[in-house]
């Protein structure tokens, strides 16, 4: 029986794309910082001159799937991380954005056979988002770990 798992020891060989929503940038900037910190600590070059990590900013989480799709067609990535923050308001807009963003990201990932980490915070309040972006825990770090694991796993399977 063969058992396959992702590895955290060869992360420095990965090529990572990050698509990030500018909407709620107080939150998304913090998530991005946590994500980049994790990637750097695992051996990836996150400097501005890096050839390992590319960052694409989009207006909001709804636009993440098309940016990820375009990015993946342009260059070869081992994994893409989609970052955003959608906070529930008084209308149904929240439900539409989350539904379409999650479906779109999943579809793009499956069509391209490249993992996309769903790093879109979905919270009811700004306080909850702040807690997940650094006050108590920075989920950006977790999203980067998932990216390292999945990027490594897919490389091993191929």
From Swiss-Prot:
Q: Which residues bind (2S)-2-hydroxy-3-oxobutyl phosphate?
A: 90-91, 132
Sorted UniProt keywords: Riboflavin biosynthesis, Transferase
For this protein, the record's PANTHER family field holds: 6,7-DIMETHYL-8-RIBITYLLUMAZINE SYNTHASE (PTHR21058:SF0), 6,7-DIMETHYL-8-RIBITYLLUMAZINE SYNTHASE DMRL SYNTHASE LUMAZINE SYNTHASE (PTHR21058)
**Record's catalysed reaction(s):** (2S)-2-hydroxy-3-oxobutyl phosphate + 5-amino-6-(D-ribitylamino)uracil = 6,7-dimethyl-8-(1-D-ribityl)lumazine + phosphate + 2 H2O + H(+)
Residue ranges annotated as transmembrane are: none
Q: Which organism is it from?
A: Prochlorococcus marinus (strain MIT 9301)
- Tell me the function of this protein: Catalyzes the formation of 6,7-dimethyl-8-ribityllumazine by condensation of 5-amino-6-(D-ribitylamino)uracil with 3,4-dihydroxy-2-butanone 4-phosphate. This is the penultimate step in the biosynthesis of riboflavin.
> Under what name is this protein listed?
6,7-dimethyl-8-ribityllumazine synthase
In which pathway does this enzyme or protein participate?
Cofactor biosynthesis; riboflavin biosynthesis; riboflavin from 2-hydroxy-3-oxobutyl phosphate and 5-amino-6-(D-ribitylamino)uracil: step 1/2
EC? Answer: 2.5.1.78
GO CC aspect terms: cytosol; riboflavin synthase complex
- What HAMAP family does UniProt report for this protein, alphabetically? Lumazine_synth
For this entry, list what GO says about its biological process: riboflavin biosynthetic process
Q: Looking at the Swiss-Prot or TrEMBL record, what is one Pfam family this protein matches?
A: DMRL_synthase
Q: Which CDD domains match?
A: Lumazine_synthase-I
């Amino acid at each position: 029986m063969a058992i396959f798992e992702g590895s955290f020891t060869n992360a420095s060989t990965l090529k990572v794309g990050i698509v990030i929503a500018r909407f709620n940038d107080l939150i998304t900037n913090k998530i991005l910082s946590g994500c980049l910190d994790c990637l750097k600590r695992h051996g990836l070059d996150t400097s501005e001159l890096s050839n390992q990590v590319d960052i694409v900013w989009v207006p909001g989480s709804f636009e993440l799937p098309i940016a990820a799709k375009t990015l993946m067609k342009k260059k070869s990535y081992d994994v893409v991380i989609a970052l955003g923050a959608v906070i529930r308001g008084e209308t149904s807009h929240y439900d539409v954005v989350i539904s379409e963003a999650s479906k779109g990201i999943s579809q793009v990932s499956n069509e391209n056979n490249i993992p996309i980490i769903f790093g879109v915070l979905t919270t009811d309040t700004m306080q909850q988002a702040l807690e997940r972006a650094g006050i108590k825990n920075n989920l950006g770090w977790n999203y980067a770990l998932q990216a390292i694991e999945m990027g490594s796993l897919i490389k091993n399977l191929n």
